[in-house]
Amino acid sequence: MSKQIVHGDQCRKKIIEGINVVANAVGITLGPKGRCVAIEQSYGPPKITKDGVSVAKAIQLKDKSLNVGAQFVISVASKTADVAGDGTTTATVIADAAVRELNKAEVAGIDIQEVRKGAEKAVEAVIADVRKNSSPVKNEEEIAQVATVSSNGDREIGEKIANAMKQVGQEGVITVEDSKNFNFEVEVVKGMRFDRGYISQYFATNREKMITEFENPYILLLDQKVSTVQPLVPVLEAVAHTGKPLVLIADDVDGEALTALILNNLKGSIKVVAVKAPGFGDRKKEMLEDIAILTNGEVITEQLGIKLEKVNDTSKLGTANRVIVTKDHTTIVHDKNNSDIEKKVNSRCEQIREAIKDTTSDYEKEKLQERLAKLRNGVAVLKVGGATEVEQKERKDRVEDALHATRAAVEEGIVPGGGVALFYASRVLDSLKFDNEDQRVGINIIKKVLEAPVRQIVKNAGGKEDVVVNELSKSNDKNRGFDARTMQYVDMIKAGIVDPTKVVRTALQDAFSVASLVIATSAMITDHEEDNNTGNRSGGGVGGGHHGGMGGMDF
């Protein structure tokens, strides 16, 4: 395929234009009076959302050069979402403003490398000030406030998330799923989460969120590594006959075995996900046993004389109501009404409590307490309903955003919301030292850019940006801000308008990181437009060996 190359000013102009297209679409969602965006789906009704990263990821521009710019800002939103779980719109708005201001400096002939150094110093100083003024989340009401703000002012969402955290603890497991009725409910069920995700992204059933979700799966627990597929064939055939999915938790899965599982998963011969077992050494064996008790299954281990190739039915496999696997975590949700499992779990918890009493190692005691918490506290499930499928999905998006924001707040604390944390933090730049005048330009650019979130929130509310910015500039109270819902100046903390420190910090860091890359770019290479319309390419699949087995499956 032939390529086209764009250099210099024309290159940067196209990139900035592409960034601006995405930023305009994402920016309108910011704040309590931000608007929703309708995203066309490949089938069914459109997706209605205020989630910045969902809006950004949905954008694919026809002009290849503009699309390069769009991808820059999409990467900002995605990275911020991955790290903080929220703040993607703020990051996008800041990145757009930073790129435009940095480009003005370069066009004016100022040494852009020195400008970047000054801007980098400014970002570090602002983040330090934000952290210094952060307050820890102290109670259920503050948790509810964070969740309410992040869910676009939906107090019910805030209260439900706070209630869920109260029941399972601030570090407990909380999942979000569709309700079968109109209501929004919190239910605590038996289950656990451990810090291991899928071995390959090809197992993801939801490509947009890159997660695997299985309803009523079988769970195969292996205390061994699997490299060849042949020992797995009997149990895979047994599960395939039931039509249910399979969660395989093992020391590791690689080589031929991994290839065959991916191939059959993609073909739909059997729904399967492979996950590495949590822990190491003896602790791994104990955690596998914990999972076995919770799922009413057995750990397949040759130490007990059980060989994998001899497992040819589902009798030794565990079960669960639901399993959710991401790249980092696996969550198992079980029926809380199963009395047999309840008894086994209680007995197992008592064993762990005795082990805690007997150990003299602080480290060992900590790990035992973690295991006890996983078994005892269960999983809080937020069941989100709605009058229509579109309404339900939109609300579910807001619940997930609010949950991410709440976790970030618990982790690093909270600061005044509405964009004022960054706005007031910019005052530290007035006394920041610089090596030359070009660096001072960079510092002043960041000072101006930090007004962008406040301006966007006011703009979306139909207010006058300059008037609000001017009014806040006169204030000596760092908690004073503009409540876009009431169009009044208030004490943001007292009004319950707060942002997680981690979200604010990450948004600024990621935005500046991408803005720096953009301004350092002087050429781009894209496909020629006419080449994109010539014929269809057949995508390569995942190869796999054929070693016999049931029809329709590749082993």
Curated annotation (Swiss-Prot):
Organism superkingdom: Bacteria
Residues that span the membrane, as ranges: none
UniProt keyword annotations, A-Z: ATP-binding, Chaperone, Cytoplasm, Isomerase, Nucleotide-binding
Catalytic activity, reaction form: ATP + H2O + a folded polypeptide = ADP + phosphate + an unfolded polypeptide
InterPro entries xrefs: Chaperonin_Cpn60_CS, Cpn60/GroEL, Cpn60/GroEL/TCP-1, GroEL-like_apical_dom_sf, GROEL-like_equatorial_sf, TCP-1-like_intermed_sf
Enzyme Commission number(s): 5.6.1.7
Gene Ontology biological-process annotations: protein refolding
Entry-linked PANTHER family: 60 KDA HEAT SHOCK PROTEIN, MITOCHONDRIAL
Function as written in the Swiss-Prot or TrEMBL entry: Together with its co-chaperonin GroES, plays an essential role in assisting protein folding. The GroEL-GroES system forms a nano-cage that allows encapsulation of the non-native substrate proteins and provides a physical environment optimized to promote and accelerate protein folding.
NCBIfam families: GroEL (TIGR02348), PRK00013.1 (NF000592), PRK12849.1 (NF009487), PRK12850.1 (NF009488), PRK12851.1 (NF009489)
Protein name from the UniProt record: Chaperonin GroEL
Gene: groEL
